[in-house]
Amino acid sequence: MDILTLIFYSIYLMIPAYLANGSALVFGGGTPMDFGHYCWDNRRLIGNGVTWRGTVCGGLFGMVIGGILGLLATYGIGSYFFNITASQITFMSGFVPQGLLVGFLLGFGALIGDAIGSFLKRRLNFERGKPVPLLDQLDFVVVSLLFVSTVVSLSLEMIVIIILVSIFLHLGANMFAYMINLKDVWY
């Protein structure tokens, strides 16, 4: 596979994770995942930024996006997503069910990763909204890749490309969210 195809495939694979992570901001609000509980260090377990509504809605949104990508692959559009993964997911037949599964794993993996990142930021005494370079950009990526690797084989090259691309996409998406007043900070 040439490098441009690998970059395209890597980005295409991660679309459910990227969109789930962004949609949690849009659909979020309500009850925090930690229910307001504090940890042994007298700081919030996760904080108000990670909510049940954002996590559930964002994760389901990732699953729907995966299903849509599967539907597109059924008609030959975006088949890169499934040229490699279809042979890996042998217990499900059809692009749409496989897409739903991959989207579910990527979407919820991204949001669990974001919650883990918030937990780590609280333990390191960073306030909500304060930047922690690389952790902010990669928490959701690493966990979503761990989740999806249970059904999809990922090459080292793909993982490196996904990490590099994700850093820049995350920064760009945050700047855009700041410009349209969805975020209070540009990072």
Swiss-Prot record:
Entry membrane topology: Multi-pass membrane protein
Any GO MF annotation of the entry: CDP-2,3-bis-(O-geranylgeranyl)-sn-glycerol synthase activity
Membrane-spanning residues: 7-27, 58-78, 100-120, 137-156, 167-187
Keywords: Cell membrane, Lipid biosynthesis, Lipid metabolism, Magnesium, Membrane, Phospholipid biosynthesis, Phospholipid metabolism, Transferase, Transmembrane, Transmembrane helix
Major localization listed first in the record, in broad terms: membrane
Pathway: Membrane lipid metabolism; glycerophospholipid metabolism
Reactions catalysed according to its record: 2,3-bis-O-(geranylgeranyl)-sn-glycerol 1-phosphate + CTP + H(+) = CDP-2,3-bis-O-(geranylgeranyl)-sn-glycerol + diphosphate
Cellular compartment(s): Cell membrane
GO annotation terms (biological process): glycerophospholipid biosynthetic process
Listed InterPro entries: CarS (IPR032690), CarS_archaea (IPR002726)
One annotated Gene Ontology cellular component of this protein: plasma membrane
One Pfam family named in its UniProt record: CarS-like
Known EC number: 2.7.7.67
Cofactors demanded by this protein: Mg(2+)
Primary role: Catalyzes the formation of CDP-2,3-bis-(O-geranylgeranyl)-sn-glycerol (CDP-archaeol) from 2,3-bis-(O-geranylgeranyl)-sn-glycerol 1-phosphate (DGGGP) and CTP. This reaction is the third ether-bond-formation step in the biosynthesis of archaeal membrane lipids.
Family named by the database record: Belongs to the CDP-archaeol synthase family.
NCBIfam families recorded: PRK04032.1
Protein name: CDP-archaeol synthase
Species name: Methanosphaera stadtmanae (strain ATCC 43021 / DSM 3091 / JCM 11832 / MCB-3)
Gene that this sequence comes from: carS
